Amino acid sequence: KANAEATVYEPIEIIKADTIESNHSLSETSESLWIYQATKWKIKLQTPTTNHSQYYRVNIKQTYTYRLTNRKTLQDSTAISTQWECSGYYDTALMDGKPGTPNNSDPIINFIPTINNYYNVFNDAYFTNNQYTMTLDSWYSFLLDNKLYKIKKITGKAIIQYYAISPAEYQYLRAANAYADHDSSNLLETPVIFPNNIKGGIGIFAIENPTETSIPLKSIEDY
């Protein structure tokens, strides 16, 4: 019989979240008109005071609500579109001390793989006095107009989500990051080993402790 134990860790505190840059571009087809939105975030964080290292992961959930009118039937309706995605490519903690730059053309030795942080995990190693300001990028494509529906209004919100995770889950997700970039045909690459904390089984049992903040995004009237 498989069994496992997990510790629930204290959540991180979001002190402040701001958008420092937001860019929009239009994309038009014969059937529809889309807006592509890219946003850069600065998020000030504070960890609880403890005598051990702390581990987290982050994501951004963006939701847009459409108020629509069918051009043929004139019937009104509501549609909701949601996307979970963000990038920490330019952040020190999420890139483990090696953030990217807009023109990152440094030579990289081919047989040393560059690990991407697909699961957006990090620890408190880069925090000072329990505080840190994180840089995140998010993007979203949403429909502005099409032939079938007249879009009367679009409202959006972003929910920035942080999860306090266990050391075991942190190591597991780091291994998953490495595995996603692993080239099994390259004999010079070390095989990825996944940690396990389930007695009599395989995998990771973990309980995450979430905290989040919601920020309204621009509505269609603002464009």
Regions found by a protein language model. Give the residues of each.
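A sequence/structural signal for flexible, mid-protein segments enriched
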Residues: A2-Y223
